[in-house]
A protein has these predicted regions:
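Bacterial N-terminal signal peptides that target proteins for export
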Residues: 2-23
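Formylglycine-dependent sulfatase
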Residues: 24-27, 31-223
Length: 223
């Protein structure tokens, strides 16, 4: 044995063991807290074909969007963006699949999704980890023959825009934007408190002109 090697101090070894024990306990505690932390709920507002120039938070002097402005003030507002295809249904399929139009499309018809490209959508991934998912609003994505959108959500309620104002059972008219929100509120009313949820509210009114030109209808009515 080499007598020149220093002997380890029992005090130092004991102290080191205590430090390692404390660090290990802290790591296990933090890891357990993170594992037990509830996943965030997701509310996805998608305004179809809406340009930033029609939002108050981007400086429009006339259009009133107070709720969107409030979300922008509390969150992140992007000043630059890029899309691979400036077509409404391509952007929707890109969001659902995570693939660009050139990636998911059928040869010779790039805006039509291939079956294998849309076999599993992002709501399917959320469902696998315990989320309850809902879809309300405009669908209109070019999917392959036999594709069923309702199979990819726990609750699926498409709402179209022709006409924008829908006649209700009591004879009154209700705008499709309000109906989309109504469906989402009903979804939340049936939601279990211990389960995370993901709601997709895909609005359609900003996509095209409202053909209902009766005076006094809507926030910006025809004269």
């Amino acid at each position: 044995m080499n007598s020149s090697l220093p002997l380890r101090s029992p005090f130092k070894v004991s102290s080191l063991r205590k430090v390692i024990t404390v660090i290990t306990f802290a790591c296990l505690t933090i890891g357990g807290m993170l594992a037990a932390e509830r996943p965030p709920n997701i509310v996805f507002f998608f305004a179809d074909d809406q340009t930033t120039s029609t939002l108050g938070c981007y400086g429009h002097p006339f259009v009133q969007t107070p709720h969107i402005d409030a979300l922008a003030a509390r969150g992140t507002r992007f000043s630059q963006a890029m899309v691979s295809h400036s077509i409404c249904w391509v952007s929707r399929t890109t969001i659902l699949s995570g693939l660009t139009g050139r990636s998911y499309g059928t040869p010779g018809q790039r805006d039509l999704a291939r079956a294998e490209a849309v076999e599993e959508l992002y709501p399917d991934l959320l469902r696998k980890v315990g989320y309850r998912t809902g879809f309300f609003g405009k669908w209109h994505a070019k999917m392959p023959k036999g594709f069923q959108a309702k199979d990819h959500f726990d609750v699926y309620r498409p709402v179209g825009r022709n006409p924008f104002y829908k006649k209700q059972p009591d004879g009154t008219l209700r705008h499709e934007t309000d109906l989309i929100v109504d469906h989402a509120i009903a979804f939340l009313g049936e939601q279990a408190a211990d389960q995370p949820f993901a709601i997709n509210l895909w609005f359609n009114a900003c996509h095209a002109e409202d053909g209902d030109r009766r005076p006094g209808i809507g926030q910006f009515p025809w004269p």
